Each structure stands twice: as structure tokens, then as C-alpha cells.
């Protein structure tokens, strides 16, 4: 991700700082480099005059229109925007070097609240979501990866094991207060 702070990317990068996936990425950056290191990276990115968007899909649309060279988005937005437009977009998916924070893998989870009034129904829903048939549909329809069936992968993408995600404790990424405060401090939100 450090290469994005180089002057060659001035005004050519799109980000969505209010988006939860970008904030999870910044939380991982804080975890990896500490708050001062994350602030330094954000300050360098801001100095490079990135284009700010509300949503990842807007970044993909801007790359497709030739308004940006690249954007930091979740990979599945390429398919989402292509589907909405009814054609392939010019934006392409690329990955950072192995272990780079730019390869962060966000996850979605499900659980049953202790206070649930319908624990049996909630557990059935989770079992359904984790079933092989649902996971296959999840991969084919949303173009996201399955952590339950890692051998499944979205079409035209490398296997998850080949992406070489950074070592990040994902359980720490849910608390976004520190991240949001840092984004406010550097003037991104």
C-alpha cells in the first residue's frame, strides 16, 4: 500500500473513507503499524489528493469512465457495477504483494444472540447459510469468496490461498471508533 503514497498516483486514486470496508482496512493498518504509522500513511495519501467517494461502486464507475486510474475497493464491486451496467467494466482487479495490507480479507459472520427469543430458528438459518448449496450460490451470485468451502472461488480470480492476505486479527476490526477518530483527525471524514 505504501506505493500509493508516491507522487505518480497524485489525483489518480479513489477511496471511500466513510465506507465500512475502508475503515476496516484502516483499523488493520492501525493494528499493524500503530496509530502514528497509520496516521503517517493517511496523511501521505491525503497529500496525494485522492478522489473521495461515498461508495465503492462509485469508484469502480469512475475508473470505468476514465476519471481515475485505480481505487481501493472490495473486488466484488467490479461484478456488481458490470451487472448494473449490463456490460463488462474497464476496471480490473489486481492484488498487492503477498502479505500487503491491501490484500486484507474482510469477513461476514453470523451468530445467535444469547437473548434471542428463537434460538432454534436462528441456528437453522445459520446452518442454511453455511450449507454447501448456499455457499456455492453465494460465490456464484455475489462473487465473494467462501471461507467455509475454500476450494470455491469467484470466476476469474485466484484461489484465496494464492491472494496471500496479511496476518491480521479480524476480531479487532469491528471497533471503528479509533479509526473514525483518526480519519477525522487527518481530514478524510
Describe the role of every protein-language-model region:
Residues 1-68, 101:
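Extracytoplasmic ligand-binding site segments that recognize negatively charged/polar headgroups
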Residues 6-10, 30-34, 47-50, 64, ...:
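Sec-exported extracytoplasmic/periplasmic mature domains
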Residues 17, 75-76, 141-142:
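Short secondary-structure boundary segments
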Residues 42-46, 52-53, 88-114:
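Periplasmic-binding protein-like
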Residues 59-60, 68, 78, 122, ...:
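Short, hydrophobic alpha-helical packing/hinge segments within bilobed ligand-binding/sensory domains
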Residues 69-90:
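A ligand-binding cleft/hinge motif common to bilobed small-molecule-binding domains
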Residues 108-167:
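Mature extracytoplasmic/periplasmic domains
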Residues 153-189:
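Extracellular/periplasmic bilobal clamshell ligand-binding domains
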